[in-house]
């Protein structure tokens, strides 16, 4: 088999066999196939696309290129959730203890964040003493006993994906549905998930700007999952504004605690209930989405979800008293109100700009080596559709420096107030095939 034949076959719009895809992935990871041939195939895939069988084969070839996490000692159906990312996306912090409270095992591997705010692990490390460096045996034991644990990423998972991802970045092949879908799904499958729930974001603050593109990606990932024996569902949710009100690590953790108490922002609560219902159904803990939703609401109302979060924090060395004493979380030195320059209705909150403003305060990383300031960030006091009076606070800047002129300048271009009302949609579609 020769790589040039595989490139020409895809260039001419033909279907690659599983053997050909395996040959490419295997050779590329070993270093036998050079970058210039791999980038040539990536471009051919970009223009000619792949069918469902090719996409599934590419995903599994990437899974098999490295280690796979074995979660077979954990009882029950392991359901993992993946979000394509957004600003203020606090869902994992709420979802993990919430679905665990209704007996769904959550064995979460998480990374540190690059970009606007930290990843799930950074947010949890805002809790004094919390750690994710636990060995596999402890991880399995914690999930079996308490239904939820979070561990840092380890092992050599999907090395093929890492290489192809870096290559796509510099060869103009990032926006290819088969390449994005196989990249995301290979990581989830390698991490040991039996079933997968996907939150595909669309809108100005999302990777997929249009609903059409988001749908195409959601269908692609759901089909890959179902084709390789992992029950998969997706929802398409809106990222035309940040989710919830908090952007920043300790601030988002506080918001997660509020949400588990039933006092969280409406949009975050709704998204969590929608995603959580799918997880509960896929874990065979409820027959219908309606029944699953009722179980989750009951877990919040009864305090079971909050109790689960406490035990989870304690199990991983954290100070669980922060649940009842949020003032023990890292606090920024200055709270600066950003006020409306005119009266009207909020019609636009540019997610990415608000995310960047939060990063300028120190809430996120530009490079892997950067330190994060866990206390800083932004809290939105108004969301799209809200009425606002001139001089009223639109958002609060939590900062450890007094001079935030650069941040204010960034925010000036990210908020629009007009004289008409805009009603945002949160959940656009649910995709099951």
From Swiss-Prot:
Chain residues that bind substrate: 168, 187
Binding site for phosphate: 81-83, 92, 108-110, 120
GO biological process: pyrimidine nucleobase metabolic process; pyrimidine nucleoside metabolic process
Cellular component terms per the entry's GO annotation: cytosol
Cofactor requirement: K(+)
Record-listed E.C. numbers: 2.4.2.2
Annotated InterPro entries: Glycosyl_Trfase_fam3, Glycosyl_Trfase_fam3_N_dom, Glycosyl_Trfase_fam3_N_dom_sf, Nuc_phospho_transferase, PYNP-like_C_sf, PYNP_C, Pyrmidine_PPas_bac/euk, Pyrmidine_PPase_CS
Cofactor, how bound (note): Binds 1 K(+) ion per subunit.
Subunit structure: Homodimer.
NCBIfam families: PRK05820.1, PRK06078.1, Y_phosphoryl
Role according to the record: Catalyzes phosphorolysis of the pyrimidine nucleosides uridine, thymidine and 2'-deoxyuridine with the formation of the corresponding pyrimidine base and ribose-1-phosphate.
This protein's name: Pyrimidine-nucleoside phosphorylase
Gene name tied to this protein: pdp
């Amino acid at each position: 088999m020769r790589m040039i034949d595989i490139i020409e076959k895809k260039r001419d719009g033909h279907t690659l066999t599983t053997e050909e895809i395996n040959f490419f992935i295997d050779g590329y990871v070993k270093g036998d196939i050079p970058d210039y041939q791999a980038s040539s195939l990536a471009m051919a895939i970009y223009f000619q696309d792949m069918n469902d069988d090719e996409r599934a084969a590419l995903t599994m070839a990437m899974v098999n290129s490295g280690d796979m996490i074995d979660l077979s000692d954990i009882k029950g159906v392991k359901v993992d959730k993946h979000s394509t990312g957004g600003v203020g996306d606090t869902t994992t912090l709420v979802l993990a203890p919430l679905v665990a409270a209704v007996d769904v095992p959550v064995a979460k591997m998480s990374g540190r964040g690059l970009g606007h705010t930290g990843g799930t692990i950074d947010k949890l490390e805002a809790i004094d003493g919390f750690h994710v460096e636990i060995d596999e045996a402890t991880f399995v034991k914690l999930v079996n006993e308490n239904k939820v644990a979070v561990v840092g990423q380890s092992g050599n998972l999907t090395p093929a994906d890492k290489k192809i991802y870096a290559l796509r970045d510099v060869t103009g092949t990032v926006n290819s549905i088969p390449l994005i879908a196989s990249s995301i799904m290979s990581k989830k499958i390698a991490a040991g998930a039996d079933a997968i729930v996907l939150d595909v974001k669309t809108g100005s603050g999302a990777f997929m700007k249009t609903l059409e593109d988001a749908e195409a990606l959601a269908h692609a990932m759901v089909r890959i999952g179902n084709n390789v024996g992992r029950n998969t569902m997706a929802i398409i949710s809106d990222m035309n504004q940040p989710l919830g009100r908090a952007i920043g690590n300790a601030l988002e953790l506080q918001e997660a605690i509020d949400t588990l108490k039933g006092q969280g922002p409406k949009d975050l609560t709704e998204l969590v209930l929608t995603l959580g219902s799918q997880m509960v159904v896929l874990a065979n803990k409820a027959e219908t989405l309606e029944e699953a939703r009722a179980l989750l609401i009951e877990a919040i109302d009864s305090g079971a979800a909050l109790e689960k979060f406490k035990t989870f924090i304690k199990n991983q060395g954290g100070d669980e008293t922060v649940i009842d004493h949020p003032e023990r979380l890292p606090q920024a030195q200055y709270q600066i109100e950003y006020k409306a320059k005119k009266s009207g209705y909020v019609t636009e909150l540019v997610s990415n700009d608000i995310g960047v403003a939060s990063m300028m305060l120190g809430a996120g990383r530009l490079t892997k080596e950067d330190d994060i300031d866990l206390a800083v960030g932004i809290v939105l006091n108004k969301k799209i559709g809200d009425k606002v009076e001139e001089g009223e606070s639109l958002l609060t800047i939590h900062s450890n420096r007094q001079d935030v002129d650069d941040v204010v300048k960034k925010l000036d271009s990210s908020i629009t107030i007009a004289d008409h009302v805009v009603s945002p949609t949160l959940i656009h579609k649910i995709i099951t095939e």
